[in-house]
Every structure is written in C-alpha cells, then in structure tokens.
C-alpha cells in the first residue's frame, strides 16, 4: 500500500539542515544560516479544523473552553481557538499530537490540507507586519491573544497575536 505524501505550500530558498517526517509531511526543523530572526515558521503540517455550530458555548473540543466573542482567542493544551463569528471557530493544534484526528461530532471540518499555516516569530516582528498590513497589532484596547481577520499583504487570512512583546 502506498503512503500519502503531503507537501507544504511553503517553499523557502534556504537549505534544510535537519528534517523530520511527521504524518507524511516533510518538516524542516532547521535551515542553514538561520541567523537571529525574525523567523517565518511553516506550520502547515499541524492539524487544523473549522467548527460551526449555533450553540458553540455547549461544545468543548479537545477539552478547552471556546472564546466567547469574535476576535478573541484561547491558547490552551496546545490548541489555538480563534472565534471568527457567532457560529464559527477555527482550531489549530500547534503542539499536541501530530495525529490528532477530527473530533467525532457534527460541525467539524478538517482544513489541514486546504489551508496554509505560518508563524512569524522573533524580534522586530511588528515592524515587519506594519509594512504589510494596516492592522494595528499593538492596539492598547486588545489583550493578547487576539484575532484579526483581514488582509496581510493583500491575502485574506486569520492573524493571531499571541503576545505583544515581539521577542517571546
């Protein structure tokens, strides 16, 4: 029986030094000449789910309480939950099990292979972001983690600020 080969949509021109195979994804762990950052990290191999339900308050996927208001986020047990609107939450399994399957309940859609997921981390991240979008990641009214739904370099996407320090 042949195995599925999954390929990330992210291609960087640097040479991989260390790679790992995870659930049929070739994951680069380290690149030659990485430097001090900031870093663009490909998380496309991490399981991602869309959850839609008219009563999201009654659902606790992966044992976490979902955020109540659109734009709010919860990072708990390695799962990032982004409240999109009244009836929709995006779920990102960031550091849990690689093979975390889709919950066996109605309302869940696996979007892992139909979406791209990257993280921009390190010092000076926000100085890069301000050149690519008009969204205010340092808005004093917003407490991290929080979600923006908007264009980033003209690409519609979800943008999550996990902290405002920019170096953590």
Predicted regions and their residues:
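Basic, glycine/lysine-rich polyanion-binding surfaces/domains
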Residues: 1-168
């Amino acid at each position: 029986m042949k195995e599925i080969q999954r390929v990330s949509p992210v291609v960087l021109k640097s040479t991989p030094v260390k790679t790992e195979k995870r659930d049929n994804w070739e994951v680069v762990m380290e690149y030659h000449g990485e430097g001090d950052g900031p870093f663009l990290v490909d998380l496309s191999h991490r399981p991602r789910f869309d959850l839609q339900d008219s009563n999201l308050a009654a659902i606790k996927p992966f044992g976490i309480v979902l955020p109540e208001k659109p734009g709010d986020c919860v990072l708990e047990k390695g799962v990032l939950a982004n409240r999109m609107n009244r009836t929709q939450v995006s779920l990102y399994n960031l550091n849990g099990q690689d093979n975390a399957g889709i919950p066996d309940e109605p309302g869940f859609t696996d979007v892992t292979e139909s979406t791209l997921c990257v993280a921009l981390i390190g010092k000076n991240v926000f100085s890069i972001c301000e050149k690519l979008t008009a969204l205010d990641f340092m808005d004093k009214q917003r407490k991290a983690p929080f979600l923006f739904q908007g264009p980033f370099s003209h690409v519609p996407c979800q943008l999550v600020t996990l902290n405002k320090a920019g170096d953590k």
